[in-house]
Amino acid sequence: MKKLKITGLSLIISGLLMAQAQAAEPVYPDQLRLFSLGQEVCGDKYRPVNREEAQSVKSNIVGMMGQWQISGLANGWVIMGPGYNGEIKPGSASSTWCYPTNPATGEIPTLSALDIPDGDEVDVQWRLVHDSANFIKPTSYLAHYLGYAWVGGNHSQYVGEDMDVTRDGDGWVIRGNNDGGCDGYRCGDKTSIKVSNFAYNLDPDSFKHGDVTQSDRQLVKTVVGWAINDSDTPQSGYDVTLRYDTATNWSKTNTYGLSEKVTTKNKFKWPLVGETELSIEIAANQSWASQNGGSPTTSLSQSVRPTVPAHSKIPVKIELYKADISYPYEFKADVSYDLTLSGFLRWGGNAWYTHPDNRPNWNHTFVIGPYKDKASSIRYQWDKRYIPGEVKWWDWNWTIQQNGLPTMQNNLAKVLRPVRAGITGDFSAESQFAGNIEIGAPVPVAAASHSSRARNLSAGQGLRLEIPLDAQELSGLGFNNVSLSVTPAANQ
């Protein structure tokens, strides 16, 4: 009986594992192929499409069939052409819809970033929109592949050549040169590519710095006093603690005005360089140029536990220092922008999902950069092209059938290539700090010594401090709220 239960459980587990292994996979219509080799017979490295797969992309398959065509599927099913409303039912046919046994997902490759040298905002934009190989031609071919007409100038027969780039408000317009004559229907109505709504986001991981100029610590003040034991017994169970607040003065300059346009997506902490410890934060969604200096304050302390013989005193010395650091820095800012295609669509074939044939004027905007919405995202539409009705904009399957998968992948990779602009400047900081509290050899005392300028502190057990602290002088050196205390040690 126990064996039967175990066997039943094993069968259930096996069934679950098989169900997981057979989870549905997307069928990309651009990879479907019709073979006329007989019922349920496909070419090498292809297999028949089953009923469920055909149903998931039925509109795409029917769109590729003749009016009264009937073609086979796997397991004794057929799919019928638009004259039969794409009905799928049991039957047989001499041709078969097939799909690769190892289909390519056709993902858009991610290229390395296109780095633009540092400059002001107009410099950065100008360099991008005038780059023929990396920008003008890829965006022109995108418009051409989608079905826009006349994406080139009058003096060239090739897409993306003889293009004019003009300033348009805060953006730029790329359009084929219209000088001289041209032949063809509405050849003077050149497709335009508008580049606008530029935005720049700081990449904190891109930080680099040049040669660091860092001073050795410079002694600015030495404070000397005494720890005095007036009692008849040695004192060693007390901590002498110096506490103070100190500010690190820092500043940064930005070489070009682009920094005013650069924002931080998340809270940004300035990287530590050298020995100067500094905590600088720029809040999320703030301009990089909104904070070019400051004096963050840090509370610090130093302690020592001296042993003072009876009726003795030991010298106590505190040294105060300052240090400074400076270096050139560079960050990268991710550049995003809107790409608006405007023109009329070719009647002989275009990729708008309804494939109009009346040459309509069409405007469409893609966002190159962070995701905004489905309508403007090339990557979203491309990745969901296997779901009929989900992408109500461009028929990317059609572009693949017309131009080939590798061609479209290569073009879209160039269009979506990340763009980064350099942000450069100079950074400097100065900080103050105290060295260790140093103690010297004990000296016998005949009587307590008092000074009007000394800080006289007692632990109440015979140990007291006489150390001169001039608050005004120390504040001028960058040390505030300075205090000395003598307290019983917590871990005697």
From Swiss-Prot:
Homodimer in solution; homoheptamer in the host membrane. After binding to GPI-anchored proteins in target membranes and proteolytic removal of the C-terminal propeptide, the protein assembles into a heptameric pre-pore complex. A further conformation change leads to insertion into the host membrane. Keywords: Cytolysis, Disulfide bond, Hemolysis, Host cell membrane, Host membrane, Membrane, Secreted, Signal, Toxin, Transmembrane, Transmembrane beta strand, Virulence. Residues 446-492 form a propeptide. One of its GO terms (molecular function) is toxin activity. The C-terminal propeptide is required for normal protein folding and secretion; it maintains the aerolysin precursor in its soluble form and prevents premature heptamerization and pore formation. One of its GO terms (cellular component) is membrane. Proteolytic cleavage and subsequent release of the propeptide trigger a major conformation change, leading to the formation of a heptameric pre-pore that then inserts into the host membrane. It comes from the Bacteria. InterPro entries: Aerolysin-like_C, Aerolysin/haemolysin_CS, Aerolysn, APT_dom, APT_N_sf, CTDL_fold. The record marks H155 as: Important for oligomerization. Belongs to the aerolysin family. Residues 1-23 form the signal peptide. Secreted, cytolytic toxin that forms pores in host membranes after proteolytic removal of a C-terminal propeptide, leading to destruction of the membrane permeability barrier and cell death. The pores are formed by transmembrane beta-strands and are approximately 3 nm in diameter. The record marks K374, E390 as: Important for heptamerization. Residues 346-355 are annotated as: Interaction with glycans from host GPI-anchor. One of its GO terms (biological process) is killing of cells of another organism. Residues 68-84 are annotated as: Interaction with host N-linked glycan. It is found in: Secreted; Host cell membrane. Disulfide bonds join C42-C98, C182-C187. This is Aerolysin-3. Residues 256-288 are annotated as: Part of the transmembrane beta-barrel after proteolytic activation of the toxin and insertion into the host membrane. Pfam families: Aerolysin, APT. It comes from Aeromonas hydrophila. SMART domains: Aerolysin.
